[in-house]
Amino acid sequence: MEIGLREWLIVIGIIVIAGILFDGWRRMRGSKGKLKFRLDRSFSNLPDEEETTSAEVLGPPRVLDTHKEPQLDEHDLPSMSASPREGKRSNSDKRGNSDKKRKDEPQQGDLNLDLDGPSLFTGRDDDFPDDKPAQRITEDKDLPPVEEVLVISVISRSEGGFKGPALLQNILESGLRFGEMDIFHRHESMAGNGEVLFSMANAVKPGVFDLDDIDHFSTRAVSFFLGLPGPRHPKQAFDVMVAAARKLAHELDGELKDDQRSVMTAQTIEHYRQRIVEFERRALTQRRG
């Protein structure tokens, strides 16, 4: 029986499809069980908050009310210029009560992450190149005063605010760890090692978190902030902070606002980046002078 051109094409097509299916099966099997964290740039494609909600400006009242948004003030944030030793002394009594709770704090590896969902953060520490240990020690001993603070606030759209357990789970997935001044910090390493890149405080006074009562804790807003001078690679640290804030707002139904209490837009984020570039330029000019 003579095989025509049509039959040959059908046979070749079947072989190609089988090869593709086999290759896909091999790749899926090879990558099974591996948890990868990557900075998800796809969140930049999320619709701006202006398109989903009308612009809301925080009102002037500072008295907490379940029907009003909290009054956010940059001065309410913990001082970025406070030394670690001062933070330890001022919170030593409270820290003693929370040590036991911190032992039970879920670790990154203990979280039930959705492997099929978008991965936002990288577990690789080489995103922030490490300096020599001697240089790191010198920097810790002589920390320069903070000249500028970049603030991104996330405000809950729900009157009940962000619930403690859900908030804790979300920020732990973003690599933040409970630490100095009873607030959360994002270090170079997802494990909580290395220099602090940025921090997150409770935007409602007194501005701290109590892990001993986290199950009953709730807040209407939190504030992410990055001080300049601060991390050795501020632009990369800022990108990680933006991703953490967007992740929280996206998953817990929050709204991003800038340091002027206006809705955060792509233009606002770009303006923040320009502030970092300008600060680095001024710092370089001062060093040369």
Curated annotation (Swiss-Prot):
The keyword Transmembrane helix applies. Residues 23-289 are cytoplasmic. InterPro entries: Cell_div_ZipA (IPR011919), ZipA_FtsZ-bd_C (IPR007449), ZipA_FtsZ-bd_C_sf (IPR036765). Its main location: membrane. One of its GO terms (cellular component) is plasma membrane. It is a single-pass type I membrane protein. Residues 48-141 are annotated as: Disordered. Residues 64-77, 85-106, 123-141 have a biased composition (Basic and acidic residues). One of its GO terms (biological process) is division septum assembly. Coiled coil: none annotated. The chain crosses the membrane at residues 2-22. Residues 1 are periplasmic. The keyword Nucleus does not apply. It comes from the Bacteria. Pfam families: ZipA_C. Keywords: Cell cycle, Cell division, Cell inner membrane, Cell membrane, Membrane, Transmembrane, Transmembrane helix. Interacts with FtsZ via their C-terminal domains. PANTHER family: CELL DIVISION PROTEIN ZIPA. Essential cell division protein that stabilizes the FtsZ protofilaments by cross-linking them and that serves as a cytoplasmic membrane anchor for the Z ring. Also required for the recruitment to the septal ring of downstream cell division proteins. Belongs to the ZipA family. This is Cell division protein ZipA. It comes from Pseudomonas savastanoi pv. phaseolicola (strain 1448A / Race 6). The gene is zipA.
